């Protein structure tokens, strides 16, 4: 059953929805607590890093269906922890200031880079580590999964910076509240059609490999990547189409505490 492409598609969809939701939930809970709670979240999540590294290493020589799933989950675990560290404000960048209005485009770009520089450096380092580990490995899907997530995320960030009609900031945590000033709500730029076209073509290429490859494990691996690429494409369209994507996770979120609530908690009232 785990060798079924449908099972791979369902797993990818569920993992995308659940992992996004649990990270957003944990960040909101920490937002409602103290500043230390965000750091605690990242520390509590450290086993994900250990599990991800161990799983990625164990999957390198295993091209079975189980090995493919292990590689995929390893990459998702590493990615999930890095995203948690970013959204918690622990690993971000040297610039934590809002972007002033009417800043020149080049200045605005480097300010935006400064808000995420350390986070991007960690992503690149992890990607390079997985790449080196899988150069001669039978199972490259841990690297493939992480690389796909990385490229899709870079594309999304660039589109948010250059301009898209819809930007959902209601889940933006307090440590990253300054990021909203670096986004641009407006008409799409030339990058958006390039991004969605590239993701569409790559999804089709991955689907072709999933259908035509004879090895059952490889077929599952390409199916997982196809679904992940289609979800990345969907996330890009969420930036343009008037779809209530926030409803997928909003019901999971505890109510955000007001500043008054925080002051009362601090005074024990």
Place the predicted regions along the sequence by residue.
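Cytosolic, membrane-interface loops and tails of multi-pass inner-membrane proteins
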Residues: 91-108, 159-183, 246-257
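Hydrophobic, aromatic-enriched interface-forming segments
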Residues: 112-167
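N-terminal signal-anchor/start-transfer transmembrane helix
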Residues: 11-28
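Intramembrane catalytic core of multi-pass membrane enzymes that act on lipidic substrates
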Residues: 65-119
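A generic, lipid-embedded transmembrane alpha helix
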Residues: 41-61, 78-82
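Transmembrane alpha-helical segments that form the membrane-embedded catalytic/substrate-channel core
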Residues: 18-21, 77-92, 147-165, 227-242
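Helix-coil boundary and interhelical linker segments in multi-pass alpha-helical membrane proteins
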Residues: 1-6, 54-73, 129-144, 205-223
């Amino acid at each position: 059953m785990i060798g079924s492409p449908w099972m791979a598609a369902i797993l990818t969809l569920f993992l995308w929805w659940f992992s996004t939701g649990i990270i957003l939930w944990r960040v909101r809970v920490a937002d409602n607590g103290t500043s230390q709670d965000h750091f605690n979240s990242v520390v509590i999540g450290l086993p994900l890093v250990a599990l991800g590294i161990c799983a990625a290493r164990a999957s390198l020589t295993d091209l079975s269906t189980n090995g493919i799933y292990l590689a995929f989950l390893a990459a998702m675990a590493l990615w999930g922890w890095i995203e948690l560290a970013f959204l918690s404000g622990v690993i971000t960048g040297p610039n934590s200031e809002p972007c002033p209005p009417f800043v020149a485009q080049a200045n605005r770009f480097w300010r935006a880079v400064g808000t995420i520089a350390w986070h991007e450096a960690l992503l690149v380092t992890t990607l390079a580590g997985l790449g080196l580990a899988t150069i001669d490995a039978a199972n490259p899907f841990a690297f493939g999964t992480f690389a796909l997530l990385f490229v899709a995320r870079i594309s999304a960030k660039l589109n948010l910076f250059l301009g898209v009609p819809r930007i959902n900031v209601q889940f933006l945590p307090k440590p990253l509240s300054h990021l909203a000033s670096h986004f641009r709500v407006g008409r799409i730029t030339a990058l958006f059609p390039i991004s969605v076209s590239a993701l569409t073509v790559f999804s089709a290429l991955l689907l072709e490999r999933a259908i035509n490859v004879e090895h059952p494990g490889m077929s599952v691996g390409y199916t997982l990547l196809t679904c992940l690429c289609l979800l990345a494409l969907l996330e890009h369209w969420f930036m343009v189409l008037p779809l209530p994507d926030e409803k997928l996770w909003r019901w999971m979120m505890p109510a955000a505490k007001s500043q008054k609530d925080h002051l009362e908690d601090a005074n024990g009232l």
